[in-house]
Amino acid sequence: MSTEGGFGGAGSSDAQQSLQSFWPRVMEEIRNLTVKDFRVQELPLARIKKIMKLDEDVKMISAEAPVLFAKAAQIFITELTLRAWIHTEDNKRRTLQRNDIAMAITKFDQFDFLIDIVPRDELKPPKRQEEVRQSVTPAEPVQYYFTLAQQPTAVQVQGQQQGQQTTSSTTTIQPGQIIIAQPQQGQTTPVTMQVGEGQQVQIVQAQPQGQAQQAQSGTGQTMQVMQQIITNTGEIQQIPVQLNAGQLQYIRLAQPVSGTQVVQGQIQTLATNAQQITQTEVQQGQQQFSQFTDGQQLYQIQQVTMPAGQDLAQPMFIQSANQPSDGQAPQVTGD
């Protein structure tokens, strides 16, 4: 053991003073040892013998060996504790910690064999006080239009937000299913329908300039749309609504007319078991022609075309007839 370490001075602490006088005091105690002093040890001899028996080469242990080994271990532990306590006082603490012992082992060469046994606790990086949160700007509503057809075709859904295309997916559907598509260019036609009291269904439609938009449904199939219900508390709820295709068999939308016009139409079905659709609104320069059949009965359709900004005053066309025998529904044209 050694007393080196640069301790001492007028301003030395109690631990440093005890360390300076440690080895002279130990040497004096060793010289004054008697046989009675070896009978009682501060460290239990049973543990010392157990440690010594861990070596496979040790077959027998003499009676004096555990006693001397216990005395040496006591001196070693006392010196290491004093050196660790110096580090504790430097950090202005009153409790000896594992890191203090590791620092004492690191600073003094005679304890190098303990570096792997008592490793120094490395400084861990500080934990983040606040987690990184990704803020997502609420996206504007994506507008779509739907088309119903009886022949197999591809479904192409394209959403546009602020003039840029964001998503695109293509898949194949079976005959009689709903086709939903979003063109990259064209005007937007919101269509609002009221189904029953307090129930409102809004379908936003868009089509390219100069192209016709058609929606057809085969016999027996259903069309599912989302309807908005305004409750008594003012909350808006969206629930799916199924419309029987036998009640709405053909829906035809003609080509848009030139100029800015507002077409407002009121559609009323006469079937007793059908749901009542009372209002359809078409905006931004497009004209709508619609026809509804149920079996052999053709329901009346009333449409009014007025320039944008003027009040609704005159009806446009009303027709009621039986469905032709060839199964093709007559088109309703506007004057």
UniProtKB/Swiss-Prot annotation:
Pfam family, one: Histone
Transcription listed as a keyword: yes
Keywords: Activator, DNA-binding, Nucleus, Transcription, Transcription regulation
InterPro entries per UniProt: Histone-fold, Histone_H2A/H2B/H3, Transcr_DNA_Rep_Reg
One CC-aspect GO term: CCAAT-binding factor complex
One of the protein's GO biological processes: regulation of transcription by RNA polymerase II
UniProt GO MF annotations: DNA binding; DNA-binding transcription activator activity, RNA polymerase II-specific; protein heterodimerization activity
Principal location listed in the UniProt entry: nucleus
Subunit record text: Heterotrimeric transcription factor composed of three components, NF-YA, NF-YB and NF-YC. NF-YB and NF-YC must interact and dimerize for NF-YA association and DNA binding.
Family, similarity comment: Belongs to the NFYC/HAP5 subunit family.
Known role: Component of the sequence-specific heterotrimeric transcription factor (NF-Y) which specifically recognizes a 5'-CCAAT-3' box motif found in the promoters of its target genes. NF-Y can function as both an activator and a repressor, depending on its interacting cofactors.
Protein name, entry field: Nuclear transcription factor Y subunit gamma
Source species of the chain: Bos taurus
Gene name of this polypeptide: NFYC
